[in-house]
Amino acid sequence: MAEPTVGAPPAPGAAAAHAASALLDWAAEPRPDRPRAVVITGPSGAGKTRFLAQFLAASGRNPRITVHATGFAEGQIARTLAWQLGRHLGYGPLDPDRLTQRLRSDPRPVLLVVTDLHRAGRGPDHLPSASPAAVVSELLGPLLALPNVRMIVESDTVDLLRAEEPLVLGLDPAAGPTGPSSADPVRAPAPATAIAGPDWRTATAEEREHALDRALATGTARELLTDPGYLVHGSVAAITATLADTSLSLPRHLREVWATAAPALSFPGLADSERAALLHAAATGRDPKLAEYLRPLAETSSWTALWSLPRRKSAALAVLPTDPAGPGTAVAADTLGRLTCHSLTDGRTLASPDSGTPWTPEALAALTPTCLLGLDRSGILHPVPLTTATVPSSAAHLTLHHNAATLASPADLPTAVAAGPRHAAVADGRGRVHLWPLHSPETGPRTIELHRSAVTAVSCLDLPQAGAVLLVTGGLDGTVRLWDSATAEALPSPVESRKALPTALGLADTEAGPVLAVAWSDRRIHLWHLLSGRLAALPTPHLGRALTLTGDGHLLQAGRDGIHAWRLDLAALWATA
């Protein structure tokens, strides 16, 4: 495909040549005296979509042009289109209001591209979301009102965007066959018949995408929405739009379950088993009947929800070192510092230890089976004993050291903590990690500088047979870095670097070897097999501030959405990654 330039227009016709030149010039040079919106318009068959595709291809090769996010508006409502844009921007799937808030605080000048605006809208005809105008009023309009946002929009009509004096680039009708009708093909009545039988696994992509649109036209939407098989395989945009209709009588927990799962379900390229696993995870702890129905298909995925406590909002989480043959115990702290011990097997509450003086947890690390290291949101470290046993000397040494350092230099404020059987790690706002030997804390920490900005997460793993310790950090620079005591050096390149921020880390020595779990701010968990460098990505329906991985493949996540436990089939995970 030829790159559109001033001298080589990307589509036939004088209008396309003029539009190509004008668009490239506008995109490359943002100026206060220029419009902040461009509308690509023209009749059906004018080649608007092809024109934009060529522009996007050219922008990737032009250092003066950066398109930060592209949204495909056909068949979308404001909420699902916002999820698309949020993912491309590195924020993750955010609803329109939160996306607008994030962009308002984003220091970048941002360029967005939206295709097929005139074909946006989904769901029951009597709801505003069925119209493209709702996408403008609820999403694109507020985004365009931000001074750092520019936008290129494809639309059959200029007035739909309602932008103030946009640059309008009109295209001539292309030669050859007429393009698709400007009528919305998603919402138009379809002549295709309904699928025979309840097995959605055999349905075509077109049947899955449009089944609910047809059911709305025939008055059978409720029957489809109460079919768990359709919820696994159906259109995320169509289901999200239709569930907004409160006149539809549906099972009591369905809307809550779907609202939890839908942002993660909207990630492209998910396998059927992964969609089932996500929906099963959202139903676990909310709708036992639906969760049990989905469990057989969910268990064909390499990751499955074990248990979930969605009402148990938590600020920090740690797994206690225990007898390997035992069931294991996780300790969670809520936003007021109150502690609860949970069984790793089923999540049941085992105890509620007194945490002493109220505090505001930022992180927890297990130093011993009876004592945790707590990091307050103010940056103060303190031991958190679970029993009346004496606080270990290692906890006293490192808390005194770092709290004194913080008083002397606020830049040394701890930002993350982690611990293993032999070492504890304290990270700070200067990008450093202080590695403490727990059996000889009087020798002081070893300090390693891994980032040039604050550390957001840290994890350490003792490897006794190798006589080494692995240290992994995540930073505000969007990188994850690995340091190995065997070489006393960090890897020259990050393990991973993304637009999103690493918010929590888990590191464990498993039967498959050392495995690293990284929770990202865009609702993804990345699992790294460190020996082979293989990566498996899990979209998660939950927001998590804390993450823990155990040697037997239990992955725990905690945050404002509660506490959630996953079973990882590590052998299958790497086989399919």
Task: Describe these PLM feature segments.
Residues 102-133:
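Conserved P-loop NTPase "ATPase switch" module shared by AAA+ and STAND
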Residues 2, 15-37, 42-52, 56, ...:
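WD40-repeat beta-propeller superdomains and closely related acidic/aromatic-rich repeat-like regions
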Residues 30-32, 102-107, 141-149:
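Conserved catalytic network of the ASCE P-loop NTPase/AAA+ motor domain
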Residues 60-75:
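Conserved catalytic segments around the Walker B and adjacent sensor/switch elements
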Residues 113-115, 137, 141, 145-157:
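Structural recognition of the conserved hydrophobic beta-strand(s) that form the central parallel beta-sheet
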Residues 1-8:
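Charged, amphipathic alpha-helical linker segments immediately N-terminal to NTP-binding catalytic cores
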Residues 75-77, 119, 157-160, 175-177:
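Conserved nucleotide-binding/hydrolysis micro-motifs of P-loop NTPases
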Residues 95-100:
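Conserved RecA-like ASCE ATPase "motif II neighborhood" in helicase/translocase motors
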